Amino acid sequence: MGQKIHPTGFRLAVSRNWASRWYANNNNFAAMLQEDIGVREYLKKKLKNASVGRVVIERPAKNARITIYSSRPGVVIGKKGEDIELLKSELQRRMGVPVHVNIEEIRKPETDAQLIADSITQQLERRIMFRRAMKRAMQNAMRLGAQGIKIMSAGRLNGIEIARTEWYREGRVPLHTLRADIDYATSEAKTTYGIIGVKVWVYKGDTLGRNDAPVVEEVAEEKRPRRNARPGGDRRPRRDGEGGGPAGARRGAPRRAGGAGDGGKTGE
């Protein structure tokens, strides 16, 4: 079922994290969830030209902390920080608690699934051919380090009468592998002949799970030569009875017949 399930929900608590990080009892949960949805819709409209990829909402101890991930943080902040202050006051009015807003820059917008999907939908609304927009996005993502990408568009493509679905893939996108870092996003293009949906999967490589440790290759230590080693190398292994004792002491040697005064000669 890796092809059908939501890639982010499938990997929650394994390699992905939640977009809303707070706890609530049964009485307040629905209201707080609806509040988060309203905040995200407001930020999507307000920061339409700021290339916002993700919004993370946290609620620590009667406060709210909102982190906005954008590839154009200057547009969010505005001249001398005026826009960010207006945004903060509006969010405080909507949420009813003090709000802290953080801006994080997306270093590679070409490999962010949400920004890719939004870029394709904007091109479709400007009547650019969908195949050209999809293939250009795939080439840019692969050029900047993505290991695989898949893009699917569905609807009345190019204004045809019957809706259809087309998708393209480059590289590999392992949807069943839990340790695979799959970035997934969707977007909609509102055209004159209907809505066109765009889905994007970006494979950025494997990530370490909670119980995994990084694999370090063992480097074999160089064998240092002994100080008094013979030039020929190590000695050959000794046989039984060799070395360490008097002559004739090895096992199985014939005993002398003569005494000590016969000069060591054997009896004739």
UniProtKB/Swiss-Prot annotation:
This is Small ribosomal subunit protein uS3. CDD domains: KH-II_30S_S3. Residues 248-257 have a biased composition (Low complexity). Binds the lower part of the 30S subunit head. Binds mRNA in the 70S ribosome, positioning it for translation. It comes from Paraburkholderia xenovorans (strain LB400). PANTHER family: 30S/40S RIBOSOMAL PROTEIN S3, SMALL RIBOSOMAL SUBUNIT PROTEIN US3C. Residues 216-268 are annotated as: Disordered. It comes from the Bacteria. One of its GO terms (molecular function) is rRNA binding.
